[in-house]
Amino acid sequence: MASGTVKWFNSEKGFGFIAQDGGGPDVFAHYSNINAQGYRELQEGQAVTFDITQGQKGPQAENITPA
């Protein structure tokens, strides 16, 4: 499981990017992959843990959990 910080997240569009701790490419984050109840969103600067998978356009975060 990887860790990182939310770089930005657009709640209206339901996606954003996470900067990985230790470097590497930013990881795409979609609201459907956030482990939370109710309205799922992330805040800029929020620490998270996640799994990285390879999506159609690059690395993608799954099982996103606020740290």
Swiss-Prot record:
GO terms for cellular component: cytoplasm. Gene3D superfamilies: 6.20.370.130, Nucleic acid-binding proteins. Pfam families: CSD (PF00313). InterPro entries: Cold_shock_CspA, Cold_shock_domain, CSD, CSD_CS, CSP_DNA-bd, NA-bd_OB-fold. Keywords: Activator, Cytoplasm, DNA-binding, Stress response, Transcription, Transcription regulation. Induction: In response to low temperature. PROSITE patterns: CSD_1 (PS00352), CSD_2 (PS51857). The keyword Cytoplasm applies. It is found in: Cytoplasm. SUPFAM superfamilies: Nucleic acid-binding proteins. GO terms for biological process: regulation of gene expression. Transmembrane segments: none annotated. Signal peptide: none annotated. Residues 4-64 form the CSD domain. GO terms for molecular function: DNA binding; nucleic acid binding. PANTHER family: COLD SHOCK DOMAIN CONTAINING PROTEINS. This is Cold shock protein ScoF. It comes from Streptomyces coelicolor (strain ATCC BAA-471 / A3(2) / M145). The lineage of its organism: Bacteria, Bacillati, Actinomycetota, Actinomycetes, Kitasatosporales.
